[in-house]
């Protein structure tokens, strides 16, 4: 998990410390290695740099680490540099930063998403997260669900900063210059939750590096992780003392830093693996190259965003901003062809805007992701609470789910547009709150009417169908009985019934079942009946 992306993160309230100010931090280094590294970057063909003493002595620079494992120190105390609190302690392990017995400084919080193993950085973060959750649990929902939650405390935390306005204006200018789509009126949204930064490697032909160190603080360690790397060819790679493979086909240019801690100019970062660094200590286990960093953004048209907020969410979204420009920009950066000046300058300026936020990482006390998780776990009771937050509170940012959106046109950010859509959302919410039973029925009538006819037919069929079926069955049965009665006399007229006495002797030549025999009635009338008694008396 990496750092969230916009400056909302860096405007959170600082923790409350005791009234007694901590002592000043004493972790200073010289800027000479930085100047030597700049010389090597401008003279990549020269193996031997001028004598180290020929460089200016440099100004003392405060150095702090972004991560310090718990097993590197026995105890840590607070110190202060530039109105910012740091931890300081003596190293007890030779493999720790600085080495055995060296006193070093590290940031109040560790690199986001990492743990120091139960040390002072973890304790500080846990303490602040509890404070944030305690504040959020005091926020409660009132009246109708469409009003959502009173997240005024969160909104104060996420107030717009001038750096964000500058970041958007820079992005919009570059988008107009290098994008084929060239959007003129749209909503540009920055994520509140985690989404990877995008790494744009510095092209070989570009040498517009700053020649002066412009920071009084050096943060040694990763500033952001889980980068989205656009391409891995034609890279400007860094050769350290322990680098063995200098024939990597991905690298088209090599630069060699000194062994001391070295920092890059504002807007340029070391990318080692999937992590970005501002400063390195002269060694790295993985291959490192120079890169710009740009924030991820989502772009909506006016209608798409209104449909998303007012009606129902839609899954269709345009690509993240850097990939909107991919066809015209990344191809040029990758092949090294001409026409890259405009796009490279854009990415450099955008990366510088981002760098201003990176340097404030030590001032941020908790990531916005932690706050969002706290809201979801404690008080976020309906999905549309953040969507409707701007209908209840002021601000120039329109909260859309887990994104913060700004309306932009050719002139830059238009804050009035946020108020306009906020009013539309508020009117829509009022309509939903004030709607009565008959009003709700009238709203559903256009959807119900097409189904009323078939539905009524089905109901009538279920009610009267059995009766109609029984009537049909009875009618058919009566007709069948009538036909049977008409056919019965004709059948009887064609049938003869024969009778004979029970003691009539069976004739060997005649039988009652023999159709060729003589019927008993006809025999009795044709000849006298012979009886056995009369024959014996004669």
UniProtKB/Swiss-Prot annotation:
Residues 21-443 are extracellular. Residues 380-396 are annotated as: Immunosuppression. Specific enzymatic cleavages in vivo yield mature proteins. Envelope glycoproteins are synthesized as an inactive precursor that is heavily N-glycosylated and processed likely by furin in the Golgi to yield the mature SU and TM proteins. The cleavage site between SU and TM requires the minimal sequence [KR]-X-[KR]-R. Residues 465-538 are cytoplasmic. InterPro entries: TLV/ENV_coat_polyprotein (IPR018154). The chain crosses the membrane at residues 444-464. GO terms for cellular component: plasma membrane. A motif (CX6CC) lies at residues 397-405. Residues 320-340 are annotated as: Fusion peptide. Disulfide bonds join 186-189, 186-405, 397-404. The mature envelope protein (Env) consists of a trimer of SU-TM heterodimers attached probably by a labile interchain disulfide bond. Interacts with the C-type lectin CD209/DC-SIGN. The cytoplasmic region is essential for the fusiogenic function. This is Syncytin-1. It comes from Pongo pygmaeus (Bornean orangutan).
